[in-house]
Amino acid sequence: MLKCIAAVGTVVWMTMFLFLYSQLSNNQSGGDSIRAWRQTKEAIDKLQEQNEDLKSILEKERQERNDQHKKIMEQSHQLPPNPENPSLPKPEPVKEIISKPSILGPVQQEVQKRMLDDRIREMFYLLHSQTIENSTKILLETQMISLMGLSAQLEKLEGSEEERFKQRTAITQRIFKSIEKLQNPKACSEAKTLVCNLDKECGFGCQLHHVTYCAITAFATQRMMVLKRDGSSWKYSSHGWTSVFKKLSKCSFDEAVGNTEAKPFAEPSPARVVSLGIVDSLITKPTFLPQAVPEQLLESLTSLHSHPPAFFVGTFISYLMRFNSATQEKLDKALKSIPLDKGPIVGLQIRRTDKVGTEAAFHALKEYMEWTEIWFKVEEKRQGKPLERRIFIASDDPTVVPEAKNDYPNYEVYGSTEIAKTAQLNNRYTDASLMGVITDIYILSKVNYLVCTFSSQVCRMGYELRQPSGADDGSKFHSLDDIYYFGGQQAHEVIVIEDHIAQNNKEIDLKVGDKVGIAGNHWNGYSKGTNRQTYKEGVFPSYKVVNDWRKFKFEALLD
């Protein structure tokens, strides 16, 4: 792995120097040359900082391996005893060391590998956003794509993904079993219960995220969750929750609640039955809200998955969206129309109706396709062979699929204009629309990569639903706007790992160890946030921080 990281570092240096040279060469006037030189000097300084970090990582890992090798050699008696301390106890046999490896090493390796991937991506975003000569930009981006493909191969070369897949699957099953035990008590009428109202005034993705909030709250407070009147009164379907999903519990609403008056949720609460309002109305946010991760799983998930909070939320959504047999049959039929077995497919979720212009900006198909093509080029480098271009489009605009087929003839385009029609505002709250949005989310969770806007709840659901599958899909997306979030979540914070001195009045200073409340990634090498120590808000280089995942001890989690 050291050789691979060193090779990646070398390519990064070569690419950046080519970029710097091109910047100087393309600025001829005196004023432009001075500005270019200043920009170049700043870039060189940043590059030197990154190089020192890379050298530090390499040296640290090299030292750890040397220490481990020395210890093994000593334990196997291949090194003479220390004459200055002959009273040292007899060392344990080598097999004891090998059978009890420290968890710290693998965790550090996984974290460092992801840090490397993140830095490469952020550097690509920086290059991609530059206004430089087109031929130079193409050359630089081609080299960066090659670099990302090389980095993606590290996982395959290490040869341990199969074991990590099993471990992630085991964690999913552990959470599932814990939810099932809490949801199915021995005595329904005696169980502590949380009542959730399904009909929040919003769309399907928003409603399912509300039920997810209810489920996580119930799990954190060790209560069974039931839908009010079993979800029989649902704006999306006159047939209720069970028209598409399985029951959430063996206990019905009448069995669990009956004539008991549900008290407003509070924690702690002595009431057996409580009713939960919407997350938007909270004044004080409980510490168990997303993006909190179970304290008992944080170390394992940090090693095994690139986005532990999305994994945890996704497991709850997977439990909630357990389809009944009729729905599963329809989904299986829809999935068969998408040739997933023929090669990779990128899923595009394109929102065009109610939220555009209010919650989200309009994004043309060209923007989605630009990042789709970049992913295919990286994947070709990773696999070492050319790939057929295939996309699946989920949209509330029936004109998008024909537009893609017309404008991108080198792509095989899949998607339903009929489903898009049911997503129109005048058709939205119908059984056909419900089945359509479920189908889109389900297929989006099965594709190889997502390009969408995370301001869309449907997009985030497709991303969340794919996380507990066993694979590490935490970074297999590109959002055209927001970073991942859960509506009503606790503040998303990051920790500074490299000092930063503001270069202009838009940037903020950072010191190692500072906490920053993250507001978003600008996808140009910079993120925006508020330094919790200085209370200054502004932008900073994204690579200088890492996520500081929140943790909460979920007592309901089984051992």
From Swiss-Prot:
For the biological process aspect of GO, one term held by this record is: protein N-linked glycosylation
Region described as Important for donor substrate binding: spans on this chain: 351-352
Output the InterPro entries linked to this UniProt entry: Fut8, Fut8_N_cat, Fut8_SH3, GT23_dom, SH3-like_dom_sf, SH3_domain
Tell me where the transmembrane regions lie: 5-24
> Residues in domain SH3?
489-550
Compositional bias annotation for Basic and acidic residues: 63-74
For this record, the Gene Ontology CC terms, alphabetical, are: Golgi cisterna membrane
Q: Which UniProt keywords apply?
A: Disulfide bond, Glycoprotein, Glycosyltransferase, Golgi apparatus, Magnesium, Manganese, Membrane, Metal-binding, SH3 domain, Signal-anchor, Transferase, Transmembrane, Transmembrane helix
| GN (gene name) | fut-8
> What is the protein name stated in its UniProt record?
Alpha-(1,6)-fucosyltransferase
Q: What is its EC number?
A: 2.4.1.68
Glycosylated at which positions? 27, 134
| Regulation of protein activity | Inhibited by Fe(3+), Ni(2+) and Cu(2+).
| Superkingdom per UniProt | Eukaryota
What is the disulfide pattern of this chain? 188-251, 196-214, 202-206, 452-459
Q: What class of enzyme is it?
A: transferase
Q: Which portions of the sequence form the region Disordered?
A: 63-90
Q: Which SMART domains match?
A: SH3
Q: In which pathway does it act?
A: Protein modification; protein glycosylation
The record places the following residue ranges in the Lumenal compartment, namely 25-559
Organism annotation:
Caenorhabditis elegans
Q: Which Pfam families match?
A: FUT8_N_cat
Which reaction is catalysed here? N(4)-{beta-D-GlcNAc-(1->2)-alpha-D-Man-(1->3)-[beta-D-GlcNAc-(1->2)-alpha-D-Man-(1->6)]-beta-D-Man-(1->4)-beta-D-GlcNAc-(1->4)-beta-D-GlcNAc}-L-asparaginyl-[protein] + GDP-beta-L-fucose = an N(4)-{beta-D-GlcNAc-(1->2)-alpha-D-Man-(1->3)-[beta-D-GlcNAc-(1->2)-alpha-D-Man-(1->6)]-beta-D-Man-(1->4)-beta-D-GlcNAc-(1->4)-[alpha-L-Fuc-(1->6)]-beta-D-GlcNAc}-L-asparaginyl-[protein] + GDP + H(+)
